[in-house]
Structures are given as structure tokens and as C-alpha cells.
Regions:
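Nucleic-acid enzyme cleavage-core boundary/entry regions
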Residues: 1-195
């Protein structure tokens, strides 16, 4: 189970990676922030568990000592109002999360997509079109939403375009994925749209 420290850092990094700051198209310079309520729903409530609230506070203080984030308190209390990411430390935070809880960083996802493009480009026309679409997304410094699903689709596209013998859908699914219903249940619609 992830600790509040890991949850806090993951929320901040994911928010940063989805922002325009990461892609370089931002116009307004705004800090990446979360509220403690995103970590523990009853943080600001009177019936909130004090141990949980204190655990969130200690996690924020530990991350602040590591230089990963800063936070603001409400007035003179120990209650945290906002938690802010230190943008310059994003790669360092991702490396920490990767070792601590197996988090997959953006650079690792990007590397995986680039390898997938290299593996499937040039095999079939439909796969080439999909690889070009993926390259366009990578140029914008973004990661395709369902890149793992896209690899399954590319695998099916290349098989179907190379195949010359008539097959039933389940036979093709067995030859591609090793499961008779995987193609039918998961990737058939996407494959048909691309063909």
C-alpha cells in the first residue's frame, strides 16, 4: 500500500505531466498544487481521524525537507491549505517514485512507445499510419493515452495484413494473442476502424 508521501508525490507529478507546463505551451505561469483533501477526504472536517491528518502533515513535511514540494498552512494552525510541487525536481521525484513504489515515469513510457514504433513501422500500411499518429503525439511531448492497448492493436494489424489464409476471428485471436476471445473482446473494434 502506498504511503501518503508516495500518493502526494504521484498526484503532483501526474498533475504536472498533464499540464501545459510539461508540453511547453503554457502562457500563464501557475504552480502545480493539490489540496490535502485529495489525499484524505476528511482532512478539513471536524470528524476526521487526527492520526490520518497528522500522517498527511508529516508526509508533507518529509517531502518538503527532501526539497520535492512546499506547502502553506492555514493561518497559525498546523493545518495545511495547499501543497505545491517544486517543478525543477520532477525527474528526481519520478526516479524516487520508481524505486519506492514502482511508478512508471514519463521518460520510461516515452521510451516504450518509441521502441513500439520502431518495432511496428514499415511492416504494414495500417500499422505505418498508426505509428505516424504515435510519432505526432510524441513530438508534442505527450504520451498516448492507451499506449499498451495500441501495441495490441498494432500486433493484430500487422498479422491481419500479412495473413493470406482465411481465418475465423477466434482462430486469428489464438494466433495473435494466444487467447481465443481477446481479439473479439478487446481490440476488434479498434483494428477494424484502422483498416
Amino acid at each position: 500500500m502506498k504511503t501518503y508521501k508516495e500518493k502526494m508525490l504521484i498526484l503532483l507529478v501526474e498533475k504536472y505531466r498533464k499540464s501545459k507546463k510539461d508540453s511547453g505551451t503554457n502562457v500563464i505561469c501557475r504552480r502545480t498544487s493539490i489540496s490535502p483533501v485529495e489525499l484524505y477526504k476528511k482532512y478539513n472536517k471536524n470528524d476526521g481521524d487526527l492520526e490520518e491528518i497528522e500522517a498527511v502533515n508529516q508526509a508533507a513535511e518529509a517531502c518538503s525537507r527532501d526539497g520535492f514540494l512546499t506547502f502553506e498552512n492555514n493561518g497559525f494552525s498546523s493545518e495545511i491549505a495547499k501543497i505545491y510541487l517544486v517543478d525543477e525536481k520532477v525527474e528526481e521525484i519520478e526516479a524516487y517514485l520508481e524505486s519506492a513504489c514502482g511508478y512508471e515515469s514519463k521518460s520510461r513510457k516515452r521510451q516504450y512507445v518509441e521502441q513500439m514504433i520502431a518495432r511496428y513501422s514499415g511492416i504494414s500500411p495500417a500499422a505505418d499510419r498508426e505509428c505516424e499518429r504515435l510519432k505526432g503525439i510524441l513530438v508534442q511531448n505527450k504520451i498516448p493515452n492507451s499506449y499498451l492497448q495500441t501495441e495490441e492493436v498494432l500486433k493484430a494489424l500487422t498479422f491481419i495484413e500479412k495473413n493470406e489464409t482465411p481465418l475465423y476471428v477466434r482462430e486469428a485471436s489464438m494466433m495473435i494473442y494466444g487467447s481465443s476471445k481477446y481479439l473479439e473482446e478487446n481490440t476488434l473494434e479498434s483494428v477494424c476502424n484502422l483498416l
